[in-house]
Amino acid sequence: MVPLSLDERRQIQATPFRFTASGHLNASAAGVFIELADPSRWFPLITSCLWHGRVGGVGSVREVHVRLFGTFRETMIAWEPAGPGGTARVAFTMTETTSPLVSCMAEDFAITPALGGVRLDWTLAAVTTALGRLAAPALRQTLRRMFAVYRPRLERLAASAPVARPSTEPARGTPAS
């Protein structure tokens, strides 16, 4: 794989190639967050997702193979589970790739509570190579179609995700009151 220049969240807004998509999901922010850990379950072109070391958390690394686009090593730059307000975020930068289309790339998934579920905002930002610039119109169309396909898949999985709930049982070793 070819190393990519490191990107940070604040640079996502300034890259030459930027794609955004938003949609409503009838699921909880916690459920969506859980499913974002393994995009091979819901993203149609991702054929594998392998974590190196711990799963999740800022600095953790995973490798995904995306059919037609190549293999990407991703480093998490934001890993924010749903808090009291219900908002959550996952963002990562690609540090290595086999793709001839990009020289720098990052993605950001923002999950915000909305009536009856959540709003998912997906931003993909990249510095494209010469080949990537030629392919940009087709890339945008492909990304738009992929979002249309993966959004309902992600929604279905997130709606049935096992979300940890506070227990009403006393903790082991804790006397019941």
What do the PLM-derived regions correspond to, one by one?
Residues G56-R62:
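Short coil-to-beta transition motif at edge beta-strands of beta-rich domains
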Residues M1-R54, P175-S177:
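Hydrophobic ligand-binding cavity/cleft-lining segments
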Residues H24, A37, G57, T75-A78, ...:
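Hydrophobic small-molecule pocket/channel-lining residues, especially in calycin-type beta-barrels
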Residues V2, T98, R119, A125-S177:
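A conserved amphipathic terminal alpha-helix motif
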Residues P44-L45, G53, R67-R119, A125, ...:
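Hydrophobic-ligand binding "helix-grip"
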Residues V32-P39, R62, M76, F92, ...:
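Hydrophobic pocket/interface hotspot
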